[in-house]
C-alpha cells in the first residue's frame, strides 16, 4: 500500500483521472480534516496486488497552496497540468517545490492531461521541466483513458524496486467519454522524444512561442 498524492492547478483533471478507476471510485473515503478524498486504486502485478491510496485535493488548491498534512507520508506523486492551459504548466515548478519540501526523494510523474483536445497551448517540445528535475513525463487523456496505467506502472516499478514489474490484468475503467486522435498523438510523442535529445533551454522560465 502506498500513499500517492496528486497535485496541480484546479481544473487540470485530477479528479476525473482518479475517478476513471471504478473500484477506487466505489471505495473512496472523504477525510474532512484536510478536505481530501482518498481513493484506493488496486493494480494487479506479477508481484501481487499493489494498492495506491490516491489523495485527491477536492478542489481546495483553488484557495492557495495545500496544507502540509496533505503531503505528509506521501510515498509517490503525480503532478498534473492541462496541455490546453499554459498557466497550469507554468505553475508546475511551484507544485514541485511544495511537494519536495515535505516529501524528499519520492518518485514523481508529471502528466500533461487533455491531449484529446484539438487546440494544445503547451506543445510537446515545450515540456522540459521533467528533464530538469529528473521526473517521468506522460501525456494522458483522462476522459479517453489514454495512457491511464502508465503513471501507476512507473510508480509501482520505482516503489517495488523492480523494473520488470508489469500489470497482469487491466483495472476496471469507466468507458471513454471522448475519442483521441491516435495518429496526431503519436506525432506529439515523436516530437517529445526528439525534444528529449536536444539541449535544455538555459533559462528557468520555459520558452513559449
Swiss-Prot record:
Segments of this protein annotated with the region Switch-I: 28-36
Q: Where in the cell is it found?
A: Nucleus
Q: Which GO terms describe its biological process?
A: protein import into nucleus; ribosomal subunit export from nucleus
Q: Sorted alphabetically, which PROSITE patterns does this protein's record hold?
A: RAN
A GO term for molecular function: GTPase activity
Instruction: Indicate, by first and last residue, each region the UniProt record lists as having compositional bias (Low complexity).
Output: 187-196
Residues of the Small GTPase Ran-type domain: 1-162
Output the Pfam families linked to this UniProt entry.
Ras (PF00071)
Keyword annotations: GTP-binding, Nucleotide-binding, Nucleus, Protein transport, Transport
* Annotated region (Disordered), positions in chain: 187-209
Segment Switch-II: which positions?
Answer: 59-75
Q: Which residues hold GTP? A: 9-16, 59, 113-116, 141-143
One Gene Ontology term, aspect cellular component:
nucleus
List the NCBIfam families hit by this protein, alphabetically.
small_GTP (TIGR00231)
> What does the function comment of this entry state?
GTP-binding protein involved in nucleocytoplasmic transport. Required for the import of protein into the nucleus and also for RNA export. Involved in chromatin condensation and control of cell cycle.
Family note:
Belongs to the small GTPase superfamily. Ran family.
Subunit structure of this chain's protein:
Found in a nuclear export complex with RanGTP, exportin and pre-miRNA.
Q: What is this protein called?
A: GTP-binding nuclear protein Ran1A
